[in-house]
C-alpha cells in the first residue's frame, strides 16, 4: 500500500495509529487485527523502548519473524540465500492449482498453500515450520482471500490475487475496491479453520486453530498452553494495548484443552 501512498511511501516510521488508518482505508481491515500485527511489527525493531514504538518495513525481513518464513507462496526458503525476491517458479506452482479458474477459493487456496509446505519440507534440510508458522501461514492465506475478495466466502478474483503477488500493487486498474465487509481477527480465524479443514493438514498437538490462536501468537503467547513464549513481544503488547482480550484468549484456549 506504500506504492499507492495509502501507507508511508518511505517504508519508515510505521506506528500503530498509522497502520490502523492505512489498513482500514486501503483494505478495510479492522483495528483489532491491525493492532495485533502492528505490535508484532514493532517487535522487529531492535530497541523499540529506546527508539520508539514503531517499525520500518525493512525490519520485517528477519527469518521466522512473522512476515518472513519458509514455504512462502511466492518466495524461496531462507536456506537458498534469497528469501526476499519474488520467485515466479514458486508462484507458478501455486497458480497451477487454479488451472484456468477465474477465482481463488478456500478449497483450492488451501491445497496450494499446503503443497508449498510439503514441497519445502521434503527438499529443504533447514526447513522451519513451528506451530507459530503453522498458525500465521493460514492467517496469511485468509488475509489475501479476504482483502482481494470476500472476508466471508473467501472467493477472490484470481486476477486481483495475481496483481497483488506479482506486481505488489492493489489492483485498482482491474476494478478492485476494498471489500465492503471488514476483515477482522474473528473472520480471519474462522477462514483459517475452513482452510485447514480443506487441506487435511494435521493441527499441531494442543493447538485449537482460530481467532484465539492467531491472537495468542501475535502477543507472544504459546497458542497451546497460553504461557508467555516471547517476552519482548508480550511486553510490547502490554504497552500498545494489544493485551486487551488476553484473558478471554487464555480462558478459551485452556477450556478447549480441558474440554470444559
Segments from the language model and where they lie:
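Polar/charged low-complexity regulatory segments
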Residues: 1-2, 7-260
Amino acid at each position: 500500500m506504500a506504492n499507492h501512498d495509502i501507507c508511508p511511501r518511505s517504508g519508515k516510521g510505521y506506528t500503530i495509529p498509522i497502520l490502523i488508518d492505512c489498513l482500514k482505508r486501503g483494505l478495510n481491515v479492522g483495528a483489532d487485527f491491525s493492532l495485533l500485527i502492528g505490535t508484532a511489527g514493532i517487535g522487529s525493531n531492535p530497541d523499540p523502548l529506546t527508539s520508539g514504538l514503531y517499525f520500518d518495513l525493512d525490519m520485517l525481513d528477519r527469518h521466522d519473524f512473522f512476515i518472513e518464513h519458509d514455504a512462502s507462496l511466492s518466495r524461496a526458503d531462507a536456506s537458498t540465500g534469497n528469501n526476499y525476491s519474488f520467485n515466479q517458479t514458486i508462484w507458478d506452482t501455486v497458480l497451477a492449482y487454479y488451472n484456468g479458474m477465474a477465482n481463488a477459493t478456500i478449497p483450492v487456496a488451501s491445497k496450494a498453500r499446503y503443497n508449498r509446505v510439503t514441497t519445502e519440507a521434503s527438499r529443504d534440510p533447514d526447513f522451519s515450520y513451528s506451530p507459530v508458522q503453522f498458525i500465521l501461514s493460514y492467517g496469511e492465506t485468509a488475509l489475501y482471500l479476504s482483502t482481494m475478495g470476500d472476508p466471508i466466502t473467501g472467493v477472490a478474483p484470481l486476477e486481483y490475487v495475481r496483481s497483488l503477488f506479482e506486481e505488489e500493487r492493489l489492483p485498482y486498474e482491474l476494478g478492485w475496491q476494498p471489500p465492503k465487509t471488514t476483515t477482522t481477527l474473528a473472520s480471519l480465524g474462522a477462514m483459517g479453520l475452513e482452510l485447514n479443514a480443506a487441506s487435511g493438514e494435521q493441527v499441531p498437538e494442543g493447538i485449537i486453530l482460530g481467532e484465539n490462536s492467531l491472537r495468542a501468537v501475535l502477543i507472544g503467547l504459546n497458542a497451546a498452553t497460553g504461557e508467555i513464549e516471547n517476552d519482548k513481544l508480550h511486553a510490547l503488547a502490554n504497552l500498545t494495548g494489544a493485551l486487551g482480550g488476553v484473558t478471554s484468549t487464555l480462558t478459551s484456549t485452556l477450556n478447549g484443552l480441558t474440554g470444559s
